[in-house]
Amino acid sequence: MGGRTLHFHLAGINNQNFIMSDEETGTWWQQVSGCAVVGPLAGRCLETIPWDEVTFEVWKREHPNTLVLRPAADAREHYAAADWEKEIARYPTVTPIDPQDRLQPRDLVVGVTSGTVAKAYPWTALVAQNPIIDTLGDTPLLVLLDLDGRSLRCFDRRVANETLDLFLRTGICPPAIVDSRTGSEWDFSGLATAGPLAGRRLARLPCLKDYWFDWKTYNPNTRVFTAGLPSGS
């Protein structure tokens, strides 16, 4: 930041979202946005780098020579043995509840932004409909789960100035993502592995698996993908 490297540690939690403090200036930074909220660097934002929400199985498959960071030998003693999700669910959220909401505060969503437009895709809808095809702003979007049902990625559906319509072809082993125009097959990395478009790659888009209350707090004007959701609150 500004030509120097900052070193961070956990300073606290705001609405169940980490607040980090840098040792160099004492500025506090919000985890979800990477932006400074209090201190000399308030208003500045860290550059976002690509990240992945995948299981180690998927990561190892795509990066067979990967290294693994070994945890400190005494790290376990700093963590409670109880189920973290059940433990954290005891604490209230501070996000105002809209009676018109069709999602509960702790429902999981996939959050995606395109320019100034944000949209939340309920995890239950993705599991039921995988993949989800949508358009967000000017971006034709693919929201995709791997066959493990846990690993998540999002892609721009445009290839060579053409927008692809993609679907999951079952009845083959393993199932494959196929575009309806050319019949090309695509893997979870976004690479076309067979067909006329073999070798082409879909552009990755950042997406975040998050709780609804957290996503809505920091994206108050977010839209919600409602196809397949039950009606009512």
Question: Can you say where each PLM-predicted feature lies in the sequence?
Answer:
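Mid-to-C-terminal functional-domain signal that highlights helix-capping/loop sites
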Residues: M1-S233
